[in-house]
């Protein structure tokens, strides 16, 4: 609890104790009034002050005005205990609401805690702390164990383990070494690092994330806008309704029925009506549900730019994926070695050595698959033939590594491979020894993510790719994707998404998931754009509505489930609060519900709605 909340709790305890004591004392008349005014003013002076200020500023109709009128009216009717109790329980509800909002804000603040306070610059052999804003691109900063990485950069010296949980929501540490890119906001766990900055602080990952979270509250959902409009008209309406309830029945009794007007009874009913009608449960719990939902998602590594996007995400029925970097790793890997007489390891060794001077992605994948240190002294007479492959001598043996065209060039007949992927043929001393199959492999969780999306009510999953149809169909079949469009240019992807948008109903939403590279136009065009692992891509963060902090496809399932849970809680609160209030308003107008029922209909409903709202903070593990 903060200082203000502790002060309020003290006031509540004092007022409650005084009410209990006064209930046991045999006092009446002016003495009873004077004694009850003590707990009433202790607990309610700030509400009365706000109500008076609202009247003075011509902003009359709010919950402070309703509480002030209802409690003062009850006291004028000599219902001192009830009037004081209404104010007491209202303040208990306010304290509870303040605590719930504070808890949500603390969750957001934990994310905000990624903001670095300083950066270390080395000067004359000593470390000097400077403001991260003062560090220029290309500067060398030092990050010691336990410190936050203040600015994006590349590691020059040092190896370490990084804690990225504040960014990705995942607790598993990540190893980092010289040459690796490092993003701001993660915590250096072990070694001392020297980092060359690649961005200014204002453009760094941590700044982008904080900007997203801070601006998320400005984008309101339809539900929030409805509640704002509802409260604007509802509060004056119930005030006039209460006034009518206090005046019209007595006038009808006197003028038409010639009966006793019973002013006290009808004024009491009107005051009960006012207490019941307070819209706190709706006005507080609905924005809190979205606020907590966005906070909970942030802690799970899912940044949602506003509650309107959370609402759209909950209505998603179609999910379109870009293949490379989203469902697949986006890097070539050796997935098979089909050999003749020569051993598999020997073929990989010859291929890796022959390709050791090349910087082509396929060369890197061959060297990674070989997995041993490469001695380039064993390699000579390297000839790289553009578009075909490499010829070289390894340990004095002629080695040719490349495609079928290279084999034909040296008069070697390659064996056709029927598997989807890039085929690298290997010939040694003019004899065909086999081929190596290289492919962009699916991420480990892609298949599970597709299955869980379908289980969670997604009607259709679609994959878009620039790959040839045979490769695309194999990946789609392996992952369980419903439909695939292959051999697409970036502009074609936008066209396909527009076609899919035209086919669905207006209530059903379409999400596009991309890795942020060349995906900005499609992310903008979909009903909701999701950028996966896009921490380093400014264009993706700008264009996307939802940003996943890492490249795990299961985060998409988590994002949709969290959004649906949030919307379910929002509608539960709307139906529950309005339903209870309508019932109690009718009972109050008929004289069946007294002031104690009114207290439950106001404070009780608000507490239950707020308790329900803060459930959105907690994101279940999949």
Segments predicted by a language model, with ranges:
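Flexible metal-binding regulatory segments at protein termini and peripheral loops
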Residues: 1-31, 101, 110, 125-127, ...
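Residue-level signature of catalytic and energy-coupling elements of molecular machines
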Residues: 51, 79, 100, 119, ...
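Conserved ATP-binding TGD loop and adjacent catalytic N/P-domain core of P-type ATPases
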Residues: 396, 422, 428-572, 580
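Conserved catalytic phosphorylation-site environment of P-type ATPases
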Residues: 66-68, 167, 268, 278-354, ...
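Actuator/coupling domain of P-type ATPases
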Residues: 29-31, 36-122, 134-136, 140-141, ...
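P-type ATPase nucleotide-binding
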Residues: 334, 338-460, 469, 481-497
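Bilayer-spanning, highly hydrophobic alpha-helical transmembrane segments
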Residues: 12-16, 225-257, 270-290, 571-600
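Juxtamembrane helix-loop transition segments at the membrane interface in multi-pass membrane proteins
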Residues: 52-60, 99-109, 288-307, 616-622
